């Protein structure tokens, strides 16, 4: 019962427990976030979307690169929105960051809008993986990159479908992505997914 409640909170943090979880995540996933950013080519003036921004730590790390980035974030959790908004208030006020609450299965952005999309420790919770990746594909520009990253153990625990690299690659290719590169270390796996048209 408690485990199910905590899993539900990890998918969509809410209330006091959600606030605590969101703050823990920002600290716990800092190392993963920095590793992902280090693995990623991020051109100056890129328009970036982070799906599942949690407490906002990845967006904060991206801003610290000082590359004049235009960053958007969407997260299903209102609690995550409030936490990230507090952390990123100055950047929100100067319009370099725009955050919203929403679902990856129905992204409120125009077609071909983003140069780079991050999904860190989040795709493992999506209800409809195919629909979610189709939506991401739609909002990506014709020469853009999707970065998917997660703890290996969480993939094994949460994903019954598309849990292996080959299954995920087949799904992404069927949607139209042209190249998938996998990188990993002892804890994490990262996919660099290219859209080229």
Task: Kindly give the residue locations of the regions a language model identified.
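Conserved alpha-helix/loop element of class I SAM-dependent methyltransferases that forms part
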Residues: 27-44
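Class I SAM-dependent methyltransferase SAM/SAH-binding core
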Residues: 49-106
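A short SAM/SAH-binding and catalytic strip from SAM-dependent methyltransferases
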Residues: 115-128
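Class I SAM-dependent methyltransferase Rossmann-like catalytic core
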Residues: 9-30
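Conserved beta-strand signature within the Rossmann-like core of class I S-adenosyl-L-methionine
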Residues: 143-151
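Core SAM-dependent methyltransferase catalytic element
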Residues: 176, 184-197
């Amino acid at each position: 019962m408690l485990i199910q409640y905590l899993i539900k909170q990890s998918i969509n943090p809410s209330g006091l427990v959600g606030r605590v979880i969101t703050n823990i995540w920002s600290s716990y996933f800092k190392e993963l976030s920095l590793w992902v950013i280090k693995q990623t080519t991020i051109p100056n003036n890129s328009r970036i979307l982070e799906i599942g921004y949690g407490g906002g730590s990845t967006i904060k790390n991206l801003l610290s690169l000082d590359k004049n980035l235009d960053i958007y974030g969407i997260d299903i959790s209102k609690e995550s929105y409030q936490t990230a908004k507090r952390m990123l208030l100055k950047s929100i006020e100067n319009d370099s960051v725009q955050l919203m609450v929403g679902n990856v299965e129905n992204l409120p952005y125009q077609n071909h809008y983003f140069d780079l999309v991050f999904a860190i420790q989040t795709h493992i919770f999506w209800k409809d993986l195919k629909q979610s990746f189709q939506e991401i594909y739609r909002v990506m520009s014709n020469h853009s990159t999707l970065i998917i990253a997660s703890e290996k153990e969480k993939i094994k625990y949460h994903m019954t479908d598309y849990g292996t690299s080959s299954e995920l690659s087949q799904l992404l290719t069927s949607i139209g992505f042209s190249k998938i590169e996998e990188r990993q270390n002892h804890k994490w796996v990262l996919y660099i997914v290219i859209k080229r048209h």
